[in-house]
UniProtKB/Swiss-Prot annotation:
Belongs to the eIF-3 subunit I family. It is found in: Cytoplasm. The gene is eif3i. PROSITE patterns: WD_REPEATS_1, WD_REPEATS_2, WD_REPEATS_REGION. It comes from Danio rerio (Zebrafish). Component of the eukaryotic translation initiation factor 3 (eIF-3) complex, which is involved in protein synthesis of a specialized repertoire of mRNAs and, together with other initiation factors, stimulates binding of mRNA and methionyl-tRNAi to the 40S ribosome. The eIF-3 complex specifically targets and initiates translation of a subset of mRNAs involved in cell proliferation. GO terms for biological process: cytoplasmic translational initiation; formation of cytoplasmic translation initiation complex; liver development; sprouting angiogenesis; translational initiation. SUPFAM superfamilies: WD40 repeat-like. This is Eukaryotic translation initiation factor 3 subunit I. WD repeats lie at residues 8-47, 50-89, 144-183, 186-225, 283-324. One of its GO terms (molecular function) is RNA binding. Gene3D superfamilies: YVTN repeat-like/Quinoprotein amine dehydrogenase.
Amino acid sequence: MKPILLQGHERSITQIKYNREGDLLFSVAKDPIANVWYSVNGERLGTYNGHTGAVWCVDVDWDTKNVLTGSADNSCRLWDCETGKQLALLETSSAVRTCGFDFSGNIIMFSTDKQMGYQCFLNYYDLRDPQQIEDNQPYISVPCSESKITSAVWGPLGEFVIAGHENGEINQFSAKSGEVLKKAKEHTKQINDIQSSVDLTMIISASKDCTAKMFDSSTLEHVKTFKTERPVNSAAISPIMDHVVMGGGQEAMEVTTTSTRIGKFEARFFHAAYEEEFGRVKGHFGPINCVAFHPDGKSYSSGGEDGYVRIHYFDPHYFDFELEA
């Protein structure tokens, strides 16, 4: 399993995303550039230039027409995927931490950080109404006074957004009214990442409390827990196998204050039903910040603190592997 190494960032990777077909891989990092790559051979197709700060999040819509990025330069930007042209600039009072298109690609959401005296807000815009974009007026803006949103993903059918918070809570925010529909508090520390399964029925949350947990996305019922000895930065659900991949390791500033075994930086594979670990993939120098499965389930990618993105194609025997119960 020889990985393809993507070198396009000079700072640590913050998020990677495949488009629906999986032919493109988008990567953003703590530098101002968003990159798009061919996932089959790692060729860089182009960049989206315009941000002036670290880019925290990226998303691409269902038909790969538009790309959305959110940055620490206090803006969320909409791009034409093919040409790299900036279509919209939405300015905020604080850094944009998460962003996403709903299933239709018409509604976007993004959340802002609680910093510099500003509140954390979850904002919804309708791209079909140019007035909202021009006036920079979201049709709903939900204040999150309790604890800031650290990761968010759209729920099934675009009815709500599932958001993970700094205090370990997971909430569903309605896209119609902005109210909290359901909430779950299974994690004890900050949620670093939330990703949904391919059919949007399940979500997996990765947390600083050294676990990743699986929830039913509509009821937020807690289904599974995957335990490790180190903080989990990202977790993803395989679209074809009952497998989960997790990446983590502690933050660079904590390296000297913790025991060395916490600092291991492999990607770890767990069986989704048995909660058993069955494999590890080494490679990154430093923690893994983001993992993502290819939509066909035959490869996965990871982005690290070292600024590299690695695309791993699975060996044939991975697909025949059965875990003995």
